[in-house]
């Protein structure tokens, strides 16, 4: 595939690592490729970062025809740059596209554009511990007409942002409020797709939690309001009686790549993992009896986020005395070690630029 590359004439000043935060700064370029029902995917290019210009009737603005992904590039200790399981993001992007009637993109096309973009922008990958270059591929319907329909025009774009920790607490345990009013998704809906509407619908509950001093919410299922699903924008895992329990993928839960990686690491260490329904009653019993040993969220942005406190119906339940658990720390060390090239990648997960 031919990718036209136009380099910027006005390079930005790179921010200090201590100021990064998450998603505040953007690199010099962006990658794009256009799709139409007549031409298919065409016009692949890497161009200077700039605002997008779209028609006021563009499908994405009115009907939410949008999906996205999130992955990272890491600076290894030898100075090189690598990505973590990028092909899994490409595969998930296409599953999301199918759900929202957006065009799927050939895996080799998406992968080539992504890797070439990271090659061009690799100097934006920070080297300080805990930092990375966050990559945000996204696709949106761009028909210049009103009316609900499958799209005839779309854009696929990749932007990059040097980042530090997702949560201000970093790897320190966070406080989570169990949500029993709003729901994130329902089976048969778009819960398994990575689309903007899922996140927009979650912000009200997140704001309520934030106002009460909590970092995020723990979601219950949308039908019975009984079974645990996700925590904030992450998958969630609990260590109960020596076993790691995580909600099974049921159509309303995003199939996280970090989740999948955690399960593989845990099994390689001989730790039993159960993917199954986990009710709030079972979790409450485990908290009250002391058999809940650890709890943590897992996702690309934060990698592993230990949970130090859960609050339900006004009652606060400490988890592991508010400390990072042994299994939680092991997963964080293993995954970040592989990502930054400090630990041997025996799984074959990294792609070197």
Predicted stretch roles:
Residues 1-117, 145-353:
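Helix-start/capping segments and mature chain N-termini
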């Amino acid at each position: 595939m031919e990718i036209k590359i136009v380099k910027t004439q006005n390079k930005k000043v790179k921010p200090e690592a201590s100021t990064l935060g998450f998603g505040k700064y953007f690199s010099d370029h962006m990658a794009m490729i256009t799709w139409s029902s007549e031409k298919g995917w065409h016009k692949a290019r890497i161009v200077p970062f700039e605002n997008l210009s779209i028609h006021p009737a563009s499908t994405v603005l009115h009907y939410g025809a949008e999906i996205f992904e999130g992955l990272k590039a890491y600076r290894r200790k030898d100075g090189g740059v690598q990505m973590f399981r990028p092909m899994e993001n490409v595969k998930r992007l296409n599953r999301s596209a199918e759900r929202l009637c957006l065009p799927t993109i050939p895996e080799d096309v998406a992968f080539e554009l992504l890797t070439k973009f990271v090659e061009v922008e690799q100097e934006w990958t920070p080297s300080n511990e805990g930092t990375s270059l966050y990559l945000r591929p996204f696709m949106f319907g761009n028909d210049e007409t009103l009316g609900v329909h499958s799209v005839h025009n779309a854009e696929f774009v990749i932007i990059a942002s040097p980042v530090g920790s997702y949560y201000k607490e970093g790897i320190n345990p966070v406080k989570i409020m169990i949500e029993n009013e709003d729901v994130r998704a329902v089976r048969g809906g778009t819960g398994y797709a990575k689309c903007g509407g899922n996140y927009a619908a979650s912000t009200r509950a997140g704001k309520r939690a934030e106002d009460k001093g909590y970092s995020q919410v723990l979601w219950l299922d949308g039908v019975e309001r009984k079974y645990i699903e996700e925590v904030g924008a992450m998958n969630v895992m609990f260590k109960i009686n020596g076993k790691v329990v995580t909600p099974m993928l049921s159509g309303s839960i995003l199939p996280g790549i970090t989740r999948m990686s955690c399960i593989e690491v845990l099994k390689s260490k001989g730790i039993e993992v159960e993917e199954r329904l986990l009710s709030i009653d079972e979790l409450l019993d485990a908290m009250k009896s002391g058999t809940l040993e650890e709890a943590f969220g897992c996702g690309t942005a934060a990698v592993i986020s230990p949970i130090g406190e859960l609050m339900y119906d006004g009652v606060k339940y400490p988890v592991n005395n508010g400390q990072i658990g042994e299994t939680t720390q092991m997963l964080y060390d293993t995954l970040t070690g592989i990502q930054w090239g400090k630990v041997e990648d025996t799984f074959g997960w990294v792609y070197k630029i």
